[in-house]
Each structure stands twice: as structure tokens, then as C-alpha cells.
Amino acid sequence: MILTFYRSGSGHVTLDLPKKDWRTALHDQQGVLWVDFNETQLVEVEPLLRDTFGFHALAIDDTLRQTHVPKIDDWDDHLYAVVHSIIFDAESLAVTTHELDIFLGLNYLVTYHHQPIDAVDWLWRHVGQDRRQFERGPDYLLYLLLDVLTAAYMPAIDALDSALDDLETTVFMQPTPQTLGTIFAVKRAALHLRRIIGPQREVLNKLARDDYAVIDPKDRMFFRDVYDHLVRLVDLNETLRDLTSGSLDIYLSVSSNRINDVMKTLTIISAFFMPISFLVGFFGMNFSALPFNSPWLLAVASGAIVLTPLLMLYWFRQRGWLSSSETRSWKNVTASATMLEASEFRGNREESTQGGNL
């Protein structure tokens, strides 16, 4: 599907401009043309990009392959940029990104994507309701698109942070394989976000600071605002990754500590039965030279069997081997550390939200 929005230099607005009129629109230096290719066949897109718009062959090849991380290329009379939108599944904590290819010229904006992208749909509705946005030029439309696309990343980071908050109690009190699965899901999502928002930050940095012929210097401040948001997102995501790694370390430590407690209990039980087994085996021997027929021998053997575990229990307690205070202390320390890191993350997130509102 191909959508077009054209505002001529005289102010006349045309939707779904026929392809045969695109060249005329491109020659209107005071007009603005936006063409959106959504799930369009490659055989239909390539001739339009090559012949009608005259884009560079390498940029067209990159567009049609759809396998790139965010980047930006300057081809003098137009810019080619690759950015990614985000799709977040709150149940599985899975992050999916869709590539959006953008061409920006002095009087046109071209977008190409295989899947529907919410930011593009929003911009289409927005300019339909307020057509004055076209008066500010295609570079301002690009700013609006990137701003909405970037804002969609914050709910995903908030949801991942909430998932880690829910794990705080579980990871200490009753860690399960499901807990480990959630930790790895958050870790995978944070890693995926890092691979996208890091390069995307550099794209916005170039748009905000470099001199491009197709961007009005007065509009660079808008791209700088989006760049600031991405910087905050990168910082929050790095903190989220650190919290996830810390939660994983704590989970493994708690699990190891529980295994150690179980092994200690089993070892103590085995230690109790070792002298008892020795006594029973000794007095169960069939040597006639030993006074096994003595009437007081039963009382001696029974007393030894009862007293030996009691003496061992007293000795173990004196040595501190049966105390769990060290385990409780370790849990308190690790819990405090995790809560401190989480509070710092929430503080950074609130600052980011407040900065975005400003």
C-alpha cells in the first residue's frame, strides 16, 4: 500500500497523489510531498525510488534488504536513515523491532517499512488533523516521526523494571525455575534494546549536530531534544542490565546457599548415625571372648547409642554449625543492595520522565 500526502506551494493539499504527478510535485520547491510505502511489493517500489526520486543505488539496495541497524547516510541532495520502532509483549517480556527506512529531501519525505508502524500511523493522523505541520517542512515531519518513535521505548523499560520489582521478593524467599526464566527474559530484552537504541542515539546525534543541506539549521534543536531522550533511555537501559545481572547473581547465590544448607543438613544427619552404626556393629559381633552375655552390657550399649547423638548435637551447636544467622545476615545484605540499586534506577527513570515532560 502506498500513501501520499502533498501540499503544494500554493497551500493546496492532495491525498493519494497519482504516481504520474510525483515528478511535478518534486519540482515544486515550495511544496512538501510525503510518500509512505507500507508492505509494498519490491518490484513496485524499486523503480519509483530509482527513477522518480533518483535515490542512490546503494541506498535503494539497503532499503530493500531490510537487515540493518540504525544508521544515517548523506547523499548530498538527500539523506538516507534507518531507524527501528519497538513492539513490546508485556506477558513474555519480549522485544521486537521493525525497521523503518527514511529518505529526506528538501521538499519530500519518503518512508518504507514491511510491517505497520505505530509512529507512522500516528503522524499520518496528526498531519491529517493539523495540516499546518506541512508548512514547517519535511525535516520537521521527520522530527515528529522520530519523537513519537522514541517515546514508545519508555513503556517497555518501565515494564521491564516492574518485572524486576516483582522478582525482588521471589528471588530471596522462594526462587523457582520460573524466576530464572523471567530474569533471562528481562536480560534478553535489555540486550536487544541496547543493540538498537545505542546506534539510534548516534543517528539523532548526527541529525542534531552535523550540517546537512536538507535540514534547516533552526530545526536541529528539535532533533537535539530527541537525542537527549535517547541518551536517557540508554542510561536507563544500562542500569536495567546491571540490575538484571545483579538479580541473576543473587538468584544463583541463593540457590547455591540453599544447596549448601541441604548438604549441611544431610552431612549432620550422616554424622549422627556414624557412631551409632559403629556401636551397633561393634556390639553385634559374634566373638565369644567378649562379654556380650553380660546383663549390664545392654544398658551400656543403649546409653551410648542415646548419649552419643546428644553429645554430638551439643558440640555442633557450640561450634556454630547449626546456626542460620550467617545465612540471614547474607540475605539481608544482598536484599539491601538490590533495593538500593532499584531505588536508584527508579530515581533515574523519574528524572528522565520529568525531563521529557519539560
Question: Which residues make up each language-model segment?
Answer:
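Hydrophobic alpha-helical transmembrane segments and their immediately adjacent juxtamembrane loops
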Residues: D228-L358
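Peripheral, non-transmembrane regulatory/ligand-interaction domains of membrane transport proteins
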Residues: M1-D216, M221-D225, H229-R232, T239, ...
